[in-house]
């Protein structure tokens, strides 16, 4: 596992259907050591802090293998590091293999996986593909957000070192996304999700309120 690219950008104004909005989704690869702060990377920023950024979404990671997938599916040779608005393009961290709560070190910084990325219209804007938000979520290739446990510095080509997880249960990012999509889960799945210390409280409340995540009668 290794860091392929570090991508940052500050918010800028763009026109969408005649309306001006600010977005930080247009990430650009940068070279040299980059400082990791509690809320973002040096040189990076988020526009709408009500849905982006904050400690639980400080850094967005996207697997390089996913970019190769979309290059083929969308027939887009122009896609590369940063195309999906990610801060870190990493090789070897697939959603099906990475549980929420996993911890790892890159450079001198340390991170924990908190939640998947749910796409919004800004992804469609960045890729100039209106249908991508639905396809992106259905694919399960969402990437995931990181909380910064220890600030530090990192740079492209740094290895990614897995660290012992402090979670007693394992729920992969892919499993979580599928439960979110289908809105049904076994009682055991619900129990495991609610036990995750790394998963933000807002997610737990959303998933279990108003019957959004219903328990299947399976005898669990």
What are these regions (language model features)?
Residues 1-125, 131, 166-220:
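Electropositive, beta-rich accessory/interaction domains or terminal extensions
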Residues 32, 142-144, 156-158:
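A short pocket-lining beta-strand/turn micro-motif at the edge of beta-sheets
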Residues 130-147:
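A mid-sequence, solvent-exposed acidic-amphipathic segment
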Residues 160-164:
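Short hydrophobic beta/alpha edge segments that flank linear recognition/processing sites
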